[in-house]
Amino acid sequence: MTARVAIVTGASSGIGLGITRALLERGYRVVANSRTISDSKDLQPSASLVLVDGDIAKKETATKVAAAAVQHFERIDLLVNNAGIYLPKPFTDYTPEDFERMIGTNVAGYFFVTQQAVAHMRKQKSGHVVGISTTVTDQPLAGAHISLPVLTKSTVPAFNRALAMEYVADGIRANTISPGVVDTPMHANADHEALKKLHPIPRLVQISEIVDALLYLESAPMVNGENIRIDGGAHAGAKW
């Protein structure tokens, strides 16, 4: 059986690193991208892993990432759009530079690489696009200062539904995974107790749970245009 080929963006740490490792453990061939991923101490190039440096917000990086997958592994079966940045501020304090930075990574960084990957997937008549969003787009919190992150991340589930319908005849699926607060180095240990209370099931989301959702989607060919929320039920209600 031919090994599946995946592209993972934002792969040098956190969720992206966890996904990359899990896919490699399961026999995938992976092209992993982040700005300086070749400096990573956690990932080393191998016959199954290609590292591509570059800002995914730039079209030339997206082109380079897709080309690396085709050059080294001859196809693209899975694209995991994980790259994203979170910049909390009161809405009126955001600068044009903040806006450009977040739109660049969270929107342009999704658009360009997806466009490249889907073009190759159409030639194969198969493929799967998975985007990582957040359930805070469903259930914003008072005082959280997240309006700009929500503006950029709320597009992901809607975009993937549209993509799912546009390319279903080409054998291409598109789905979304939306976690709540994830236990990554981005959150200081001192903040964990407060962050747990943001979920009705009072704990942080584990990276392994996001990996499990991805593996489920990979194994479920009739699931298309879906948004799997992993937040202990936070999206379902405002009080608990």
Predicted regions and their residues:
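A short, exposed helix-loop element centered on a Lys and neighboring polar residues
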Residues: 114-115, 161
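Conserved glycine-rich cofactor-binding loop
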Residues: 12-13
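Active-site loop of short-chain dehydrogenase/reductase
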Residues: 4, 75-76, 121-134, 169-172, ...
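Catalytic loop of short-chain dehydrogenase/reductase
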Residues: 130-155, 160-161, 165-169
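C-terminal substrate-recognition "lid" of short-chain dehydrogenase/reductases
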Residues: 111, 207-230, 235
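Substrate-binding pocket helix/loop in short-chain dehydrogenase/reductase
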Residues: 90-91, 98-100, 195
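Conserved Rossmann-fold SDR core element
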Residues: 75-77, 157-160, 164-182, 223-230
